């Protein structure tokens, strides 16, 4: 049994390194910028505050039985949000973590949700690169996986 655990750990280790590097970069950025939970700032700049944050609030309301997933009565005279829900990745399984967050901390929790998504983006990209380019050197695959996860941030 112990041997199986060691084999599994050895297989998973290369996949965990890109995620760990991404997490370190994100945490250092959050700390240096004083972004919640390491300070009072938030990452709700520009369109994040106008588009993404209200969708997180709408998703929170849906998960707690207070709203429809596809229609929002709080925007104008009501609006169909199905395109927005899909375009802004609101149906990501990682957003289920939002269920655990109190509604008054949605804006602050966006930094944590973003960090979690970025870590898994780097792991997924490493898996893709490892599958498509198995002969590519490990540091190169790791570097590109980390760069991919950070390119949208």
PLM features per residue range, with description:
Residues 1-35:
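Start-transfer (signal-anchor) and selected internal transmembrane alpha helices
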Residues 4-7, 73, 131:
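Short linear motifs in intrinsically disordered/low-complexity regions
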Residues 16-20, 112, 141-146:
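Hydrophobic alpha-helical transmembrane segments
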Residues 126-149:
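Transmembrane-helix signature of polytopic, membrane-embedded enzymes
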């Amino acid at each position: 049994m112990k041997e199986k655990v060691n084999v599994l750990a050895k297989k998973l280790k290369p996949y965990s390194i890109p995620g760990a590097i991404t997490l370190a970069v994100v945490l250092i950025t959050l700390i240096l910028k004083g972004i919640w939970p390491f300070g009072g700032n938030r990452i709700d700049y520009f369109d994040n505050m106008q588009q993404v944050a209200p969708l997180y609030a709408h998703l929170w309301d849906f998960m707690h039985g207070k709203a429809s997933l596809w229609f929002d009565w709080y925007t104008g005279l009501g609006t169909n949000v199905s395109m927005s829900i899909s375009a802004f990745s609101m149906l990501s399984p990682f957003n289920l973590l939002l269920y655990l967050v109190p509604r008054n901390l949605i804006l602050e929790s966006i930094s944590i949700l973003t960090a979690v998504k970025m870590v898994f983006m780097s792991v997924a990209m490493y898996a893709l690169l490892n599958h498509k380019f198995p002969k590519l050197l490990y540091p190169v695959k790791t570097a590109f996986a980390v760069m991919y996860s950070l390119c949208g941030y």
